[in-house]
Amino acid sequence: MAIRKKSTKSPPVLSHEFVLQNHADIVSCVAMVFLLGLMFEITAKASIIFVTLQYNVTLPATEEQATESVSLYYYGIKDLATVFFYMLVAIIIHAVIQEYMLDKINRRMHFSKTKHSKFNESGQLSAFYLFACVWGTFILISENYISDPTILWRAYPHNLMTFQMKFFYISQLAYWLHAFPELYFQKTKKEDIPRQLVYIGLYLFHIAGAYLLNLNHLGLVLLVLHYFVEFLFHISRLFYFSNEKYQKGFSLWAVLFVLGRLLTLILSVLTVGFGLARAENQKLDFSTGNFNVLAVRIAVLASICVTQAFMMWKFINFQLRRWREHSAFQAPAVKKKPTVTKGRSSKKGTENGVNGTLTSNVADSPRNKKEKSS
């Protein structure tokens, strides 16, 4: 009874456990401060920097387009404030998914601690990957990326973005930045933190690089491709936790993972190595956002190639570990067959002894006693 009373007792205010249990409510209050600031004229100018997208430019309508004017956006230092606000939103959404979806499933399935943490990770990431993949695909279709692939490098620099494009990148940066405090909120194990930091850092590095170097068209295509493959992996792992015999999803993911790496390299080399290399304007100009110079192109291709090689190395190690576990699981089943035959033969030998030696009962049987007396 004493243990139950301790568990129901609320922790002290602003203590370590209090922050962990109520971090979503605390973050919600901080986000509400920015939203309430929009209601007052004094604070509206400061709050609007956090809530809405900045640096918009209105372009007049052309003859080819509609009669209405078009609003486009470019990036700037104020985007950091917007990323911070939507990082708070990502923390709130993370807590809602955890409490109202994943925790309920965990109570029904009764997972172990190891499976519990992996299930939560795959549940959160599969929801994010699905949403981002659908959103990114919608942008690709609406802006004719699929019908005209040359848009990846044509008219570079792509310093002006549509509302959907810029909001997509702001949301991506906000989500992966929110993953850092989630390591603390979710009580991540110390041995898992380095792995988490590596892939969070890789996401932020490549997304921010595509955003700042005005390679947002190429970055969007590669993100949608990568997110689709990762969504398939995490949704397969969710099905695997519910039924350990489920392996079809992993087999399909393994094929698509390799194809995804090849497509990433092909699109990157085609866009950066050939498309931008043949462009007329190849001068470094920070005012217009033109980074189409040889050094930048080599750095971009090198970072992409190194990342793809690192992912393939992790993938090969993952597959080897799975094959070892599968072979180790089948090995005891093969070894059990000869033990059954030995057991049958040992039953026949129990009349004379155990393991080739006479027992005391056999040695002292009446027949042996008669032979001894004679």
Swiss-Prot record:
Give compartment(s). Endoplasmic reticulum membrane
Keywords (alphabetical) are:
Endoplasmic reticulum, Glycoprotein, Host-virus interaction, Membrane, Phosphoprotein, Protein transport, Translocation, Transmembrane, Transmembrane helix, Transport, Unfolded protein response
Which residue ranges does the entry give as Lumenal-facing topology?
Answer: 51-76, 143-159, 214-217, 273-297
Reply yes or no: does the keyword Aminoacyl-tRNA synthetase apply: no
Q: Name one GO cellular component term.
A: endoplasmic reticulum membrane
Biological process GO terms, please? cotranslational protein targeting to membrane; protein insertion into ER membrane; response to unfolded protein; SRP-dependent cotranslational protein targeting to membrane, translocation
**Sequence ranges assigned to domain TLC in this UniProt record:** 117-326
Where do the TM regions start and end?
A: 30-50, 77-97, 122-142, 160-180, 193-213, 218-238, 252-272, 298-318
Q: Which Pfam families match?
A: TRAM_LAG1_CLN8
Instruction: Tell me where it mainly resides.
Output: endoplasmic reticulum
Expression induction per the record is: Up-regulated upon endoplasmic reticulum stress.
| PTM annotation, UniProt | N-glycosylated.
Origin: domain of life: Eukaryota
The answer to whether UniProt assigns keyword Membrane to this entry is yes
Q: What's its membrane topology?
A: Multi-pass membrane protein
Q: A single GO molecular function, which one?
A: signaling receptor activity
Share what the entry says about its subunit structure, partners included.
Answer: Interacts with SEC61B. May interact with Derlin-1/DERL1. (Microbial infection) Interacts with human cytomegalovirus/HHV-5 proteins US2 and US11.
Q: What does this protein do?
A: Involved in the translocation of nascent protein chains into or through the endoplasmic reticulum (ER) membrane by facilitating the proper chain positioning at the SEC61 channel. Regulates the exposure of nascent secretory protein chain to the cytosol during translocation into the ER. May affect the phospholipid bilayer in the vicinity of the lateral gate of the SEC61 channel, thereby facilitating ER protein transport. Intimately associates with transmembrane (TM) domain of nascent membrane proteins during the entire integration process into the ER membrane. (Microbial infection) In case of cytomegalovirus infection, participates in US2- and US11-mediated ER-to-cytosol retrotranslocation and subsequent degradation of major histocompatibility complex (MHC) class I heavy chains, thereby decreasing the immune detection by cytotoxic T-cells.
Q: What protein name is recorded for this chain?
A: Translocating chain-associated membrane protein 1
Q: Which organism is it from?
A: Homo sapiens (Human)
The organism's lineage? Eukaryota, Metazoa, Chordata, Craniata, Vertebrata
